[in-house]
UniProtKB/Swiss-Prot annotation:
Broad class of the protein's primary localization: membrane
Any one GO molecular-function label of the UniProt entry: monooxygenase activity
The protein's name: FAD-dependent monooxygenase ctvC
Organism: Aspergillus terreus (strain NIH 2624 / FGSC A1156)
Topological relation to the membrane, as annotated: Multi-pass membrane protein
Pathway info: Mycotoxin biosynthesis
Binding positions (FAD): E37, A51, R110, D310, A323
PANTHER family (UniProt xref): FAD-BINDING DOMAIN-CONTAINING PROTEIN-RELATED (PTHR47356:SF2), FAD-DEPENDENT MONOOXYGENASE ASQG-RELATED (PTHR47356)
Lineage of the species this protein comes from: Eukaryota, Fungi, Dikarya, Ascomycota, Pezizomycotina
UniProtKB keywords: FAD, Flavoprotein, Glycoprotein, Membrane, Oxidoreductase, Transmembrane, Transmembrane helix
Glycosylated residue positions: N358
Length: 473
């Protein structure tokens, strides 16, 4: 480990993508840490895919890990956005990203990413498995974390990287409401909701089909996401709108039988050209059905506890930013810890509070915009409402490469590790963000033509809406 700051120990709860990324960052910063993981292994074979986009990839590049991620991924150059009536259009966002940032669109199994992060962690003895946290207790300027097997760990800061069902978040709320009754109101504790289900899986190659691209199949109340995997295998996701909204923790739980029923019901749905979902389903290797929680909590920290990643920020997989914003949060928090431990004195409670408050406020502002985009895209791709459906089908295809715009825009203004040098691919010479380029527009004339077209479509939609309302009178 590097660094010469005072003795300061971080207890990371959860060997997740967030937790292991933070472990790498702290190692490079010379900060003492331990990772407590409740499962018996660090990278269980859970099967879900994860996308690494430039805002997460640049941090992995700084840590020297991105090249190992690239080695596990199947390259692709475009995204097919397909509709029920047979119409489709392409986004060149993977090619745009590679040209602009030097980073490939990376899609791999979450367990593969965890394996990479763990394998390349210099000191694996700091990652302890079968250590489910049951209690967190403040002791003056120290924190005590108790695990289910009775072990107790002492540290200066506890970081919750333990996912959507976070014990750390629950303990933070408990302690906060003991020390300041009402600090975490019930409204915030009940602010996470579920409106969509998700079946994610992986399939072996489909006979006669090679060289897959990323596919987004848009339909009424559902969305298919297809990602190419190594060896012409496929990652796939089926997202469906649920009959009504659920408030966490009273959310549905799904069995494998539920997943089979839904997938068989979707078997006849077209995916790409002559391939239907039944062809992908027939080659299935593994699958699982879950509820998709959505929320950005407002309170991220209290005292010497802070939550990051899915424990505090949960979105659907539609824009692929869940893991990437979690990686950003790990890097941003590492920057904060590094900064407050460089004056050779133990940071006070007040110093820690101000540092965590500034970090939370800054990162939450960025996440507010990304969450808004995620919620909008999720409902847009599920054709939720006739206005959204009309925009998706008839307006968006003529507005330039909106998909590339979103990816490129979210790649800027994110966190980087301030105590490590930037490389070419982590942003040292990234081109300046110019909005007309991100739209894929080569000429102002083309922009004018598209603007006029879109304005005309909007007027037609408004007239249709007005006529519809008159007819209802």
């Amino acid at each position: 480990m590097e660094g010469k700051g005072p003795s300061f120990k971080v207890i990371i709860v959860g060997a997740s993508v967030t937790g292991l990324t933070l472990a790498h960052c702290l190692h490079r910063a010379g900060i003492d840490y331990v990772v407590l993981e409740k499962h018996h292994e660090v990278h269980p074979p859970i099967g879900a895919a994860v996308a690494i986009l430039p805002n997460g990839g640049r941090i992995m590049e700084q840590l020297g890990i991105f090249r190992h991620i690239e080695d596990r991924c199947q390259p692709f150059q475009r995204v097919h956005l397909c509709f029920q009536d047979g119409f489709y259009y392409d986004s060149l966002s993977p090619s745009v990203v590679l040209k602009r940032f030097g980073l490939k669109f990376a899609a791999l199994e979450r367990t593969q990413l965890l394996e990479i992060l763990y394998t390349h962690l210099p000191d694996k003895s700091r990652v302890l498995t079968s250590k489910g946290v049951v209690r967190i207790t403040p002791h003056g300027n120290k924190m005590s974390v108790t695990t289910a097997d009775g072990d107790e760990f002492q540290g200066d800061l506890v970081v919750g990287a333990d996912g959507v069902h976070s014990v750390t978040r629950r303990e933070m709320w408990r302690i906060a409401n003991i020390e300041q009754p009402g600090l975490i109101p019930f409204k915030e504790q009940a602010s996470m909701s579920v409106e969509f289900s998700c079946i994610f899986g992986m399939s072996n190659p489909i006979p006669g089909r090679k060289h897959w691209q990323h596919i987004i199949r848009i339909g009424p109340g559902f969305t298919f996401l297809i990602f190419p995997a190594a060896g012409d295998s496929l990652f796939w996701v089926l997202i469906e709108k649920l009959p009504h909204k659920y408030i966490y923790p009273d959310v549905p739980r799904f069995s494998q039988e539920d997943a089979v029923t839904r997938c068989e019901a979707a078997a006849s749905q077209p995916v790409w050209q002559e391939v239907r979902f039944r062809d992908i389903w027939a080659q299935r290797r593994g699958f699982r059905m879950v509820a998709l929680e959505e929320n950005l909590f407002r309170t991220w920290h209290h005292g010497r506890i802070i939550c990051i990643g899915d424990s505090i920020s949960k979105m659907t997989p539609n824009i692929g930013q869940g893991a990437n914003t979690a990686i950003e949060a790990a890097a941003g928090l590492a920057n904060v810890i590094y900064a407050i431990t460089q004056n050779h004195h133990q940071p006070s409670d007040d110093t820690i509070h101000r540092a965590l408050a500034n970090f939370s406020e800054r990162h939450r502002k960025r996440l507010d915009a990304i969450h808004l985009e995620s919620r909008w895209i999720t409902r847009l791709e599920a054709c939720q409402g006739w206005v959204v459906t009309a925009f998706t089908r008839y307006v968006a295809p003529h507005c330039g490469d909106l998909f590339a715009l979103g990816v490129v825009r979210n790649s800027y203004n994110g966190e980087v590790l301030q105590f490590l040098p930037l490389t070419e691919r982590s942003g040292k010479h990234w081109p300046k963000l110019e909005w007309w380029n991100t739209w894929g527009l080569s000429k102002w004339q083309e922009f004018g033509e598209r603007l006029v077209y879109c304005f005309g479509v909007v007027i037609l939609l408004w007239i249709s809406w007005a006529v519809f309302n008159v007819n209802q009178l």
